């Protein structure tokens, strides 16, 4: 089973979401749990392999506006961003 690794400030973003927006936090937890149980490149959140300058990373939908940006190997799922869409400044 894989483990989650929160890179940079993503743990802070996770905790802020948990405190400030319970509904969005619950929506985030569903794909996280799904990725831990099965293939992180499939399942909930419409997984999408990113291209160009984000090549090697994946995206899953949390809401219409928010995304989870991550990559994975056989042991870990690395979380790089939680929140806004990856093409927004």
Predicted regions: what is each one?
Residues 1-3, 11-26, 44, 59-89:
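Enriched for short, Lys/Arg-rich terminal
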Residues 31, 50-53, 69-73:
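Short alpha-helical linear motifs
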